[in-house]
Curated annotation (Swiss-Prot):
Keyword Heme listed: no
A single MF term (Gene Ontology): heparin binding
GO biological process terms on file: phospholipid efflux; positive regulation of sperm capacitation; single fertilization; sperm capacitation
Annotated function: Binds to spermatozoa upon ejaculation and may play a role in sperm capacitation. Displays heparin-, gelatin- and phospholipid-binding activities.
List of glycosylated residues: 36, 46, 57-59, 64
Similarity remark: Belongs to the seminal plasma protein family.
Signal peptide residue numbers: 1-25
SUPFAM superfamilies per UniProt: Kringle-like (SSF57440)
Location in or out of the cell: Secreted
Entry GO terms, CC: cell surface; extracellular space
Protein name in the entry: Seminal plasma protein BSP-30 kDa
Length: 183
């Protein structure tokens, strides 16, 4: 047992020493000179930056809607962090998500993070540039009855569920669409 403890201490000590970085003091200042804190320059930078005249606002507000003509990227539903303020993206409540919707050839049955940091959904069944950030109210509804492995279910089920959590299908036929959510 003692040899194992010794090997462990050697391994742990070596790991600690490998993580240490050498400290280089640099040039030694002349005796009697005033010390300068690291990173301090004698002069401040003189660069200036021209900002655009428009008023900008961040878009991290939930429930934000953007029409296609305001889209900052080609067919990407995520606005830039600085988007022009307008009447549409200041709206807090908007139309409902169109579930299921198709975006770039893939069908979505719930909000997605595709090309985005935040959850969003399309307002059209075929994505045409009209979209919004999702809220708690934008969750898709369970569809009852639904078919799972050729059996009909009238309510949420725990069959084949991870940790026995109840789930439901988002379409009438799970076997065909594979769309589901936890209840």
């Amino acid at each position: 047992m003692a040899p194992l403890v010794g090997l462990f201490l050697i391994w742990a000590g070596a790991s600690v020493f490998q993580q240490l970085h050498p400290v280089n003091g640099g040039d030694i200042p002349d005796p009697g000179s005033k010390p300068t804190p690291p990173g301090m320059a004698d002069e401040l930078p003189t660069e200036t930056y021209d900002l655009p005249p428009e008023i900008y606002t961040t878009t991290f507000l939930p429930r934000t809607i953007y029409p296609q003509e305001e889209m900052p990227y080609d067919d990407k539903p995520f606005p830039s962090l600085l988007s022009k303020a307008n009447d549409l993206n200041a709206v807090f409540e908007g139309p409902a998500c169109a579930f299921p919707f198709t975006y770039k050839g893939k069908k979505y049955y719930m909000c997605t993070r595709k090309n985005s940091v935040l959850l969003w959904c399309s307002l059209d069944t075929e994505y045409q540039g009209n979209w919004k950030f999702c809220t708690e109210r934008d969750e898709p509804e369970c569809v009852f009855p639904f078919i799972y492995r050729k059996k009909s279910y009238e309510s949420c089920t725990r069959v084949h569920s991870f940790f026995w959590r109840r789930w439901c299908s988002l379409t009438s036929n799970y076997d065909r669409d594979k769309a589901w959510k936890y209840c």
